[in-house]
Amino acid sequence: MNKLLIMKKLILYTLLLFVSFSYGQKKELRNANKFYTSGEYSSALDLLDSSKSLFDSSDDKIKSQVMLLYGKIHTSMEDFSLAIKAFDMSRNMGISNQILSPELSKLETAIITSAVGDNETENFSEAAKKLKMVYDINPEINQEYLYYAASSAVNSMDYNLALEYYLLLSDIKYEGIETKFYITEVASGSEIEINSETEFNLLKKSKDYSNPRE
């Protein structure tokens, strides 16, 4: 009888310990999400990092949510390579495509916007790397961004990198761009050609550009 009582107490203790850990994990994740939502990205990141040992003992469902939040934070902080890694880990841990896909779309838009800025300031080397990231996120859909990455690599005079990208384009049998987009720079009055519909849609929203056309 005593053994049965001891066993029941052990089971109860283990259950309480599990519930306590689970509550603690969810509480820290909620708090980190609050920091993120309020735009306090560094605080959200610090809280996740300081709670690493707590999250390490969690199940994959919690871990996938933690990595998703890491990805969202790094996207907002423009740490794009870290964001990609975090989202990949979240996917591998079982996060649903319904939850992940919108975040990947936001990441793609953020990277493209940053690359557009790099090209405008003639930082072609960084633009090439970022556009390659967009391709890597979804190689089946984003093949055109590998083409843009190669073009930026040429502009940066990194011909070895450009050749690497062009050879990859050949390997995937990229057939080129069919639709051309045009928009006028307000400052110069010059019309420029835009090959990306996403970039075109972003520039249309800018006061620095006018007269968009296809």
Q: Residue ranges of each PLM-predicted region?
A:
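Alpha-helical tetratricopeptide repeat
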Residues: 137-145
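Positively charged n-region of N-terminal signal peptides that target proteins for export
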Residues: 1-10
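TPR/TPR-like (Sel1-like) alpha-helical repeat modules
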Residues: 75-95, 154, 159-177
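Hydrophobic h-region of N-terminal signal peptides that target proteins for export
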Residues: 15-23
